[in-house]
Regions:
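Structured, active/binding-site neighborhoods that engage oxygen-rich ligands
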Residues: 1-186
Length: 186
């Protein structure tokens, strides 16, 4: 595998990407999973950090300025890449996501999306990654992958796509989920 450790410039881009994701995620958290009309009726325009409202089962336990599992999984992905000197190892990514999920009780608090939850439970119970069904048609992989676009070289499109695909495998193996992640990372 190629070494894709980031340069100083790439590190700055990755940090900017992570900060942007965390801030945007925390800003949007109160309206998580709500349709546009409900968001407008409840909040009007969201222009500052707000706590998750008690009426929103997806956000009711979040404090103002707290980001969601999307950013936590993004950080777990970056930790796995750093641990492996830039090599995209799906099992290392899964391990880091599971460490975060257990640390914050993501399974018990129902923080994870349905696809991530099912895949991570299967992995934790010892099911091999290649035996987990490719049923992840949700957007969880796309939500965590943006910094890979700052890190990966783009000259070799096939290599780029393969690295993003590998990053998706722990939770989202379907073609549509992988395609969405590639678009975000690109």
């Amino acid at each position: 595998m190629s070494d894709i450790r980031p340069t100083y410039i790439a590190e700055s881009r990755i940090l900017g990407c992570l900060f942007g994701q965390a801030i945007g995620d925390a800003m949007g958290m109160p309206s998580e999973l709500w349709p546009k009309r409900r968001i407008i009726n409840h909040f009007g325009w969201i222009e500052r950090f707000l706590p998750g409202p008690k009426e929103n089962i997806a956000a009711c336990e979040f404090r103002a300025a707290e980001f969601t599992d999307d950013t936590h999984q993004c950080i777990a992905l970056m930790d796995a890449l750093d641990e492996n000197n830039g090599v995209t190892d799906p099992l290392a990514i899964a391990r880091h996501i599971l460490l975060w999920a257990r640390r914050c009780q993501a399974f018990e608090k129902n923080i994870l999306g349905p696809t991530s939850k099912a895949s991570l439970i299967a992995l934790e119970q010892g099911q091999p990654l290649d035996e987990i069904a490719a049923n992840g048609v949700t957007n969880g992989a796309a939500m965590r992958v943006a910094p890979m676009g700052c890190r990966l070289p783009t000259e070799d499109r096939a290599f780029f796509i393969e690295q993003v695909r590998l990053s998706c495998l722990p939770t989202h193996k379907s073609d549509i989920a992988i395609a969405g992640a590639v678009v975000i990372a690109w």
